[in-house]
């Protein structure tokens, strides 16, 4: 099988990799780059566990081919930390109790980050709509919503 070369900005670093054209972006990130925050949940783009920020928008990587990432900018949870410490948004998730098993957390945080990067003062409805593509079986959604609202308030102060 022919290989393809993918050039991308991954977590702030220019990266290049040769891979199979039928490889999913999820598998490229996990297997080839070792970015294990990107989780496989449903494999249908419905649960949000595999969410990354792709050119500024949250996308599910289980339904994307790796080749679609050529010349793109991708942020995973590994790229969100600030100087090796949890970002403000990550801290807010912890402090609001929005983390239990943690499986959905990377996708939740990246979806929230994409929202707040575009709209630093979203309404409650905008938060609910933005987070609707991410499923959680543990905490429910009240604490997750509260964590995003808490981050908005802390950034305003």
Curated annotation (Swiss-Prot):
SUPFAM superfamilies xref list: 2Fe-2S ferredoxin-like (SSF54292), CO dehydrogenase ISP C-domain like (SSF47741)
Record key words, sorted: 2Fe-2S, Iron, Iron-sulfur, Metal-binding, NADP, Nucleotide-binding, Oxidoreductase
Catalysis: reaction(s): nicotinate + NADP(+) + H2O = 6-hydroxynicotinate + NADPH + H(+)
Cofactor note: Binds 2 [2Fe-2S] clusters per subunit.
pH dependence comment: Most stable at pH 8.0. Unstable at acidic pH values.
Keyword Magnesium: no
Taxonomic superkingdom: Bacteria
Pfam families: Fer2, Fer2_2
Domain named 2Fe-2S ferredoxin-type: residues: 4-80
EC number per UniProt: 1.17.1.5
UniProt: [2Fe-2S] cluster 2 binding residues: 101, 104, 136, 138
EC class: oxidoreductase
Cofactor: [2Fe-2S] cluster
Any GO molecular function: nucleotide binding
rRNA-binding is among the record's keywords: no
Pathway where this protein functions: Cofactor degradation; nicotinate degradation; 6-hydroxynicotinate from nicotinate: step 1/1
Protein name: Nicotinate dehydrogenase small FeS subunit
Origin species: Eubacterium barkeri (Clostridium barkeri)
């Amino acid at each position: 099988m022919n290989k393809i070369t993918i050039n991308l900005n991954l977590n702030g670093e220019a990266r290049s990799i040769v891979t199979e054209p039928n490889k999913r972006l999820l598998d490229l990130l996990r297997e080839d780059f070792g970015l294990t925050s990107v989780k496989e949940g449903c494999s249908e783009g419905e649960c949000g566990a595999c969410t990354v920020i792709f050119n500024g928008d949250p996308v599910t990587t289980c339904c994307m081919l790796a080749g679609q990432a050529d010349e793109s900018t991708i942020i995973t949870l590994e790229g969100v930390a600030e100087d090796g410490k949890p970002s403000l948004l990550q801290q807010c998730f912890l402090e609001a109790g929005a983390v239990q098993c943690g499986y959905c957390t990377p996708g939740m945080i990246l979806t929230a980050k994409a929202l707040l990067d575009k709209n630093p003062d979203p309404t409650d409805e905008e938060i609910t709509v933005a987070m609707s593509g991410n499923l959680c079986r543990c905490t429910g959604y009240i604490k997750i919503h509260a964590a995003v609202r808490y981050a908005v308030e802390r950034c305003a102060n």
